[in-house]
């Protein structure tokens, strides 16, 4: 793996925590800062010391972000991507903690959009901004940042150049209104894995919901013999309330080293934060169910249902609690079928509701193909979505070459778990304009969106009945670039061949 597993300390959070903790423990990694729930499930005395890697579920529950030192991140990512062939991984362009030079390109109501380039030896002590008069940052930018006005004490105008730090990065498939890779700020932070130093901050802040624990921890920190860099204060997270005095001191010393490096404008490469984003496909979510099931009662489709949102997640917790823990003599879950009917009737989508077709790409980004109405629903997992083509109409339908006109309909039939779906295009008068069959990762029907990742190769059926397989070259290019694993590409090619034969009959 390129690194010693015993030197990698991983903290895991979110809906995938139990399965990923089990997977990493089996691969001989050290888990630290475990939550009370994880401690109870594994009955292990996990250490509360600083981490070198964090694994955190994304806000949309679709995957995880892995952040920390480069060698450790790569090592952990390799282990977790092996959970399923439809787990896809991409580099995080803006991992938290990385410092950039930014130029404001657009001001909005509550924040500004900025172009980001890597900062070279930022002068953070003097507060002077870099002299980049000869550089047009938007042309050289590696990413886009969103700077909330309440994350800076500066007056922001379009064209301003400043030093910023990534405070929270977003996965490439994220579809927020900010259109940014990260939320950034002008306040600099030095994360030590258990404690964080904040430039311009005073005293000690404890980020915990327990006031008594906060007071006790603040008192412990006052007992530690450390020299803080001038102008930096301390913030510690909730996990630190369970840490020993020795562990606290170690975490603070690590944060101090990073703060001094930031102040000197020379952050050491071995401690610079890097990141990988992992998106779990449906097949991978079910593989994670199996891993979790070896630890605790887990219904079929546990992670698939939880990925639908907080309400669905709470429903899963209730169902599993009622079924009881493994081996305790209570009622157990017997069936191994995903309860599509129950899940969609409870949370959606069902007939008459509107959903988006959310089209992921192997390069990491994703976009909506548009909203449509669910015009048919079946308990076997099939959903029909009808979209009306509006506007003046221009151009042609992708690959089909037939005119795209206002009044056309696009009828898409998807089935939960299937590796493909057809869309039939018809004119206002019902004339067939062609059928486009998209080959993709197993489809998931979430309450507000149908989701998958497109695998490039497709099969089309023209109005005259001719069948053609298209975009094999794009699939091959994606494999060469490392965007699609070979095993996933083989599956896509196999599905394409089967569909081509079936449609040509």
From Swiss-Prot:
InterPro entries: DUF402, FomD-like_sf, Ntdp-like, RNA-bd_FAU-1
Pfam families, A to Z: DUF402
Keywords noted in UniProt: Endonuclease, Hydrolase, Nuclease, RNA-binding, rRNA processing
One of the GO BP terms on file: rRNA processing
Record bears the keyword Chaperone: no
Top-level enzyme category: hydrolase
GO MF term set: mRNA 3'-UTR AU-rich region binding; RNA endonuclease activity, producing 5'-phosphomonoesters
Family membership noted in the UniProt record: Belongs to the FAU-1 family.
Role this protein plays: Probable RNase involved in rRNA stability through maturation and/or degradation of precursor rRNAs. Binds to RNA in loop regions with AU-rich sequences.
UniProt xrefs under PANTHER family: PTHR39159, UPF0374 PROTEIN YGAC (PTHR39159:SF1)
Protein name: Probable ribonuclease FAU-1
Organism whose genome encodes this protein: Haloquadratum walsbyi (strain DSM 16790 / HBSQ001)
Gene: fau-1
């Amino acid at each position: 793996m390129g690194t010693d597993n015993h030197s990698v300390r991983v903290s895991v959070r979110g809906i995938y925590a139990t399965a990923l903790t089990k997977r990493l423990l089996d691969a001989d990694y050290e888990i630290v800062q475990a939550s009370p729930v994880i401690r109870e499930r594994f009955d292990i005395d996990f250490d509360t010391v600083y981490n070198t890697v964090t694994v955190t579920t994304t806000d949309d529950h679709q995957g995880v972000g892995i952040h920390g030192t480069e060698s450790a991140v790569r090592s952990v990512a390799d282990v977790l991507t092996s959970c399923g062939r439809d787990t896809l991984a991409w580099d995080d362009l803006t991992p938290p903690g990385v410092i950039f030079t930014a130029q404001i390109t657009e001001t909005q109501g509550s924040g500004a959009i900025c172009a980001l380039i890597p900062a070279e030896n930022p002068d953070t002590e003097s507060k002077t901004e870099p002299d980049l008069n000869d550089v047009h940052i938007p042309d050289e930018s590696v990413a886009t940042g969103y700077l909330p006005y309440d994350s800076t004490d500066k007056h922001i105008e379009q064209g301003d150049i400043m030093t910023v730090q990534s405070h929270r990065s977003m996965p490439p498939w994220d579809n927020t209104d900010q259109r940014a890779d990260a939320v950034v700020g002008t306040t600099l932070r030095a994360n030590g894995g258990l404690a964080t130093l904040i430039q311009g901050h005073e005293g000690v802040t404890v980020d915990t919901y327990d006031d008594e624990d906060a007071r006790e921890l603040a008192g412990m920190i006052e007992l530690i013999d450390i020299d803080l860099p001038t102008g930096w204060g301390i913030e510690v997270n909730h996990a630190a309330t369970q840490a020993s005095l020795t562990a606290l001191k170690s975490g603070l010393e690590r944060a101090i080293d990073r703060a001094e490096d930031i102040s000197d404008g020379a952050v050491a490469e071995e401690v610079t934060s890097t990141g990988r984003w992992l998106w779990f496909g449906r097949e991978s979510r079910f593989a994670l169910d199996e891993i979790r099931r070896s630890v605790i009662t887990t219904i079929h489709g546990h992670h698939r249902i939880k990925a639908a949102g907080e309400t669905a997640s709470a429903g899963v917790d209730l169902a599993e609690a009622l079924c009881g823990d493994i081996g305790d003599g209570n009622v157990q879950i017997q069936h191994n079928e995903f309860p599509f009917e129950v899940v969609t009737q409870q949370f959606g989508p069902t007939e008459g509701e509107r959903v988006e077709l959310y089209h992921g790409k192997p390069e990491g980004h994703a976009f909506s193909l548009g909203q449509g109405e669910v015009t048919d629903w079946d308990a076997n997992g099939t959903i029909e979505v009808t979209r009306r083509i509006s506007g003046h109409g221009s151009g042609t339908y992708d690959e089909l070459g037939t005119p795209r006109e206002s009044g056309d309909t696009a009828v898409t039939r998807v089935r939960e778990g299937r590796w493909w779906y057809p869309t039939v295009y018809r004119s206002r008068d019902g004339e067939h304009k062609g059928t486009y069959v998209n080959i993709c990762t197993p489809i998931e029907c979430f309450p507000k969106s149908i989701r998958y990742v497109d695998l490039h190769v497709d099969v089309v059926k023209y109005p005259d009945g001719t069948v053609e397989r298209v975009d094999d070259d794009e699939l091959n290019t994606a494999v060469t670039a490392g965007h699609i694993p070979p095993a996933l590409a083989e599956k896509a090619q196999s599905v394409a061949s089967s569909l081509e034969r079936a449609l040509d009959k």
